[in-house]
Amino acid sequence: KWHYGGYAATRAAAARAHLTELLPALLLTIAKAGNADLSFSRFDNFLSRLPSGVQLFALLRTHDDLRELLVQLMASAPRMAEAVIHRAHVMDGLIDPAFADEVSRRTVLVGKVDAFLADARDYQEGIDRARIIGQEQQFLIAAGLLSGTMSARQAGEQFTALAETLLHRLFIAVRVEFEKRHGVVPGASVGLLGFGKMASREMTVASDLDFILIYEVEGGAEDSNGEKPLATSQYFARLTQRLVAAVTAPTSEGVLYQADMRLRPSGNAGPLATSLSAFQRYQEESAWTWEHLALTRARVVDADEGFAAKIEGTVAAILSRPSAAGKTIDDVVSMRALMAKERPPRHPFDLKLVPGGLIDLEFVAQSAQLLAREQIGRPQAPTAIVLARLGEIGLVPEGARLAEIHGVFSTVLQAMSAALADPFKDEGWTDAFRDLLAQLTNEPSFTRLAEDLKEMQGEVQSAAERWYARAQEL
């Protein structure tokens, strides 16, 4: 089938010529892979679904390292192989001599995204181009992670920088388009407050965008001033809908991100957009403990000039209010027990939800931020930084070790998301993928990694229990 044009990728004479020259080196590379039979089978499946082969075969002929990486992806990272099927040209970025140096640099990433989006001729093309560059850059960041070129922490920062840049550019485009019909609300300022992994710069390739839209109107305007004016609350609700659609709507180029807006006041039952004063009132009078926990790492990810500082000041004021230690800790312990019952881990490596996993580390850090914010002195900091600081000031003596464990858990979860479309289905867990996990976590073997992770989970559980007992008396 390969040599007789049985696949679309090999129908062109030029493709078959390249493949003939490539084949000896390709077979040798596959033979060296962890599971040669599986790697060959996956490469054949990959080839059968590839729409065109000329460009890719030419690249693989002339770049040994690229050929080795692609075979490695076949064996250990089927999600990455799938991306190559849909956009074979993403491999071009891997042969750039500057790739290893540039893949972890935010300024380079932002520059590439901005330059690509600047060529959009209209609004819809901008929406499509955001998806194209987003998927390409996600692939390159994931490749940097899985090849060991960058750490899990760096990958999280780059996935987040990509998401923020795309969200910022799309928000500008959405507002320009929206204002053509509805004008602006005089005296209004708008900002996006990010939560979760986006806020802490720990996004993975599969992360949602977790944010809410907050606005403020000075001067008392009640309506927008466009051809089709809208009441202020309706204006910002519609604007939010347009932004969410720009990010989540499927186009011919796919979906950019899923959006999670459950942390807006009153959750999914509340308005899509909220005024700053209403946000503060809700947080101070009606919010649950879990909402305050989430607020401890919230971060403004986009805002009109001067408005970010207002939102940040409001968040600081909310979190500076005294919290009853007993009630806070009781609520945290109850929430964790309910989560264990309603959202049990789906796999032994579901390191977010397993007892002693990421959730427990986050609950320790976030509850400490509620009860000892000034003493910690790291407002809105990511979990690992808070944990390390808790060790420094003696509130959680094991803090430095917990921060280290957080790094290991994050590395495993980043790699799982980058390599596997469904990390919790066993068929993706090939020997090659297991070996990759061990390599990325500096473990001698996968068996040793699994054993060490179990020990780490026990350490986290014990440290969390001691913290909760101590925190009751703060």
Enumerate the predicted regions with their spans.
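A nucleotide- and high-energy phosphate-metabolite-utilizing enzyme signature
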Residues: 1-474
